[in-house]
Amino acid sequence: MLSNLRILLNKAALRKAHTSMVRNFRYGKPVQSQVQLKGRDLLTLKNFTGEEIQYMLWLSADLKFRIKQKGEYLPLLQGKSLGMIFEKRSTRTRLSTETGFALLGGHPSFLTTQDIHLGVNESLTDTARVLSSMTDAVLARVYKQSDLDILAKEATIPIVNGLSDLYHPIQILADYLTLQEHYGSLKGLTLSWIGDGNNILHSIMMSAAKFGMHLQAATPKGYEPDPNIVKLAEQYAKENGTRLSMTNDPLEAARGGNVLITDTWISMGQEDEKKKRLQAFQGYQVTMKTAKVAASDWTFLHCLPRKPEEVDDEVFYSPRSLVFPEAENRKWTIMAVMVSLLTDYSPVLQKPKF
């Protein structure tokens, strides 16, 4: 009987301890910030100021420090649910979002094209309204940016771009966090893009100048970035006193660059163009020859998955490659995005230098 009583008392103590932990997870004095992102959509970094993007990176560093380094339990998203709509397959976006949202106490629900067809079986308007009634936010990985725009217009909850034909903002946040950790600051860095004029490059163009970073981009003829995005990027560069150059010469783009960046040459949905693209991108592989004209402190980034024709093993697996630290940072940055859009949490960690 005494043994049963001890068991009951121990269970009660554990329940009390768990309740206390949940209620008191936000210890430490938060650092005050004027940035308020709660309730916003994240469709493109074009819609965010430099200060707002810095805040998301600051929050990423804060969560990484408190959870990974200090081992704290932070159920900031307890009771929250996330709808994840994926028209395109994914490893890092799906895994980082699912594990990150769950780590913060939330419940992610994954939907593929087998479960939901945007605008096919049901209008985007109706889908947005249904999701708004059942979840607290939606992360959508889609073929068309216009679908995200409609979802955001019709939904009453935050919509996050997990990738579209035009932008991939959450990837760029992970890139910037990784570079800040490595260099100690982003201001003054020169980013050298060598590859396709795609959604990754577009997202860099919508944000780099806001941090005081210069951009040198090389793309093959016929594969340049969207002209409207180039025009806006030129405006950002002028406003922030940074350089923006576009060329068809990979070595010209790499010259003096601190960060060599490339991506897949053949994105999902472009498989029929494989032969044509491989021919067009001849000479665009990032190698040590490319690195020789870069800055002495050069590093390398690739958002993955990677093919050998895009970057050789010598660069990809070198100590200069930040590819795998960046892949991990996908988790901390998407966690920060969700926390900033869904809660009033303020970072405890002192703001890093940007």
Swiss-Prot record:
<dbReference type="GO" id="GO:0019240">
    <property type="term" value="P:citrulline biosynthetic process"/>
</dbReference>
<dbReference type="GO" id="GO:0005543">
    <property type="term" value="F:phospholipid binding"/>
</dbReference>
<dbReference type="GO" id="GO:0006593">
    <property type="term" value="P:ornithine catabolic process"/>
</dbReference>
<feature type="modified residue" description="Phosphoserine">
    <location>
        <position position="133"/>
    </location>
</feature>
<dbReference type="GO" id="GO:0055081">
    <property type="term" value="P:monoatomic anion homeostasis"/>
</dbReference>
<keyword id="KW-0007">Acetylation</keyword>
<keyword id="KW-0809">Transit peptide</keyword>
<dbReference type="GO" id="GO:0042802">
    <property type="term" value="F:identical protein binding"/>
</dbReference>
<feature type="modified residue" description="N6-acetyllysine; alternate">
    <location>
        <position position="88"/>
    </location>
</feature>
<comment type="subunit">
    <text>Homotrimer.</text>
</comment>
<dbReference type="Pfam" id="PF02729">
    <property type="entry name" value="OTCace_N"/>
</dbReference>
<dbReference type="GO" id="GO:0006526">
    <property type="term" value="P:L-arginine biosynthetic process"/>
</dbReference>
<dbReference type="GO" id="GO:0042450">
    <property type="term" value="P:arginine biosynthetic process via ornithine"/>
</dbReference>
<feature type="modified residue" description="N6-acetyllysine; alternate">
    <location>
        <position position="231"/>
    </location>
</feature>
<dbReference type="InterPro" id="IPR002292">
    <property type="entry name" value="Orn/put_carbamltrans"/>
</dbReference>
<dbReference type="GO" id="GO:0031667">
    <property type="term" value="P:response to nutrient levels"/>
</dbReference>
<feature type="binding site">
    <location>
        <position position="168"/>
    </location>
    <ligand>
        <name>carbamoyl phosphate</name>
    </ligand>
</feature>
<feature type="modified residue" description="N6-succinyllysine; alternate">
    <location>
        <position position="144"/>
    </location>
</feature>
<dbReference type="GO" id="GO:0032868">
    <property type="term" value="P:response to insulin"/>
</dbReference>
<feature type="binding site">
    <location>
        <position position="268"/>
    </location>
    <ligand>
        <name>L-ornithine</name>
    </ligand>
</feature>
<keyword id="KW-0028">Amino-acid biosynthesis</keyword>
<dbReference type="GO" id="GO:0016597">
    <property type="term" value="F:amino acid binding"/>
</dbReference>
<keyword id="KW-0835">Urea cycle</keyword>
<feature type="modified residue" description="N6-succinyllysine">
    <location>
        <position position="80"/>
    </location>
</feature>
<feature type="binding site">
    <location>
        <position position="171"/>
    </location>
    <ligand>
        <name>carbamoyl phosphate</name>
    </ligand>
</feature>
<feature type="binding site">
    <location>
        <position position="263"/>
    </location>
    <ligand>
        <name>L-ornithine</name>
    </ligand>
</feature>
<feature type="modified residue" description="N6-acetyllysine; alternate">
    <location>
        <position position="70"/>
    </location>
</feature>
<protein>
    <recommendedName>
        <fullName>Ornithine transcarbamylase, mitochondrial</fullName>
        <ecNumber>2.1.3.3</ecNumber>
    </recommendedName>
</protein>
<feature type="binding site">
    <location>
        <position position="199"/>
    </location>
    <ligand>
        <name>L-ornithine</name>
    </ligand>
</feature>
<feature type="modified residue" description="N6-succinyllysine; alternate">
    <location>
        <position position="88"/>
    </location>
</feature>
<feature type="modified residue" description="N6-succinyllysine; alternate">
    <location>
        <position position="70"/>
    </location>
</feature>
<comment type="function">
    <text>Catalyzes the second step of the urea cycle, the condensation of carbamoyl phosphate with L-ornithine to form L-citrulline. The urea cycle ensures the detoxification of ammonia by converting it to urea for excretion.</text>
</comment>
<feature type="modified residue" description="N6-acetyllysine; alternate">
    <location>
        <position position="238"/>
    </location>
</feature>
<feature type="modified residue" description="N6-succinyllysine">
    <location>
        <position position="274"/>
    </location>
</feature>
<dbReference type="GO" id="GO:0005759">
    <property type="term" value="C:mitochondrial matrix"/>
</dbReference>
<dbReference type="GO" id="GO:0000050">
    <property type="term" value="P:urea cycle"/>
</dbReference>
<feature type="modified residue" description="N6-succinyllysine; alternate">
    <location>
        <position position="238"/>
    </location>
</feature>
<feature type="active site" description="Proton acceptor">
    <location>
        <position position="303"/>
    </location>
</feature>
<comment type="similarity">
    <text>Belongs to the aspartate/ornithine carbamoyltransferase superfamily. OTCase family.</text>
</comment>
<comment type="pathway">
    <text>Nitrogen metabolism; urea cycle; L-citrulline from L-ornithine and carbamoyl phosphate: step 1/1.</text>
</comment>
<dbReference type="InterPro" id="IPR036901">
    <property type="entry name" value="Asp/Orn_carbamoylTrfase_sf"/>
</dbReference>
<feature type="modified residue" description="N6-succinyllysine">
    <location>
        <position position="289"/>
    </location>
</feature>
